[in-house]
Curated annotation (Swiss-Prot):
Pathway: Pyrimidine metabolism; dUMP biosynthesis; dUMP from dCTP (dUTP route): step 1/2. It catalyses: dCTP + H2O + H(+) = dUTP + NH4(+). Catalyzes the deamination of dCTP to dUTP. The keyword Cell cycle does not apply. This is dCTP deaminase. SUPFAM superfamilies: dUTPase-like. Keywords: Hydrolase, Nucleotide metabolism, Nucleotide-binding. It is an enzyme of class 3 (hydrolase).
């Protein structure tokens, strides 16, 4: 059962759930908290690679990712990031979120943005118990026009679901946590699997 607005506020007040900066009451809805777009992005470079062999040797996968992923792009206040039709880009939320070991989070896009062709997550919308950091956004423009995305705009909504008990292996305590304390648009670390 997902937390309702009253419970989200109570968990924030008690410090069991942390969203920094804390959202104003107007952004805490019936069962979600609106989140904003941060200013860090990452894209695919122009490249000539025919494919990336995701099951290949780790050093080859790592080298291929280095060739195709851009450095992190940091926008200044007022600047826009243009996502063209058919393009994938990574970004992060403005807010940093910390979940306790007995709570899982879910990221959903906004219907108003989806109606323009913007997907805010390709498949990974679960936020593991014990997570701490900004939430990665996997943007895809399935529309017909470029979309101007500006830091600070409302970009998605988080909901939270209590677990039957605390996780034995919360994300922040796992030795193999590839994205622990992520603050920027971190590229895929599939080579660390």
């Amino acid at each position: 059962m997902r937390l309702c607005d009253r419970d989200i506020e109570a968990w924030l007040d008690e410090g069991r759930l942390s969203i920094n900066p804390r959202p104003p009451v107007e952004r805490i809805n019936g069962a979600t908290v609106d989140v904003r777009l941060g200013n860090k992005f990452r894209t695919f470079r122009g490249h000539t690679a025919a494919f990336i062999d995701l099951s290949g040797p780790k050093d080859e996968v790592s080298a291929a990712l280095d060739r195709v992923m851009s450095d992190e792009i940091v926008l200044d206040e007022g600047d826009a990031f243009y996502l063209h039709p058919g393009e994938l880009a990574l970004a992060v939320t403005f807010e940093s979120v910390t979940l306790p070991p007995d709570l899982v989070g879910w990221l959903d896009g906004r219907s108003s943005l989806a109606r323009l062709g913007l997907m805010v997550h390709v498949t990974a919308h679960r936020i593991d118990p014990g997570w701490s950091g900004c939430i990665v956004l996997e943007f895809y423009n399935s529309g017909k026009l470029p979309l101007a995305l500006r830091p600070g705009m409302l970009i998605g909504a988080l909901s939270f679901e209590p677990l039957s008990g605390p996780a034995a292996r919360p994300y922040n305590r796992r030795q193999d946590a590839k994205y622990r304390d992520q603050q920027g648009a971190v590229a895929s670390r599939i080579d660390k699997d």
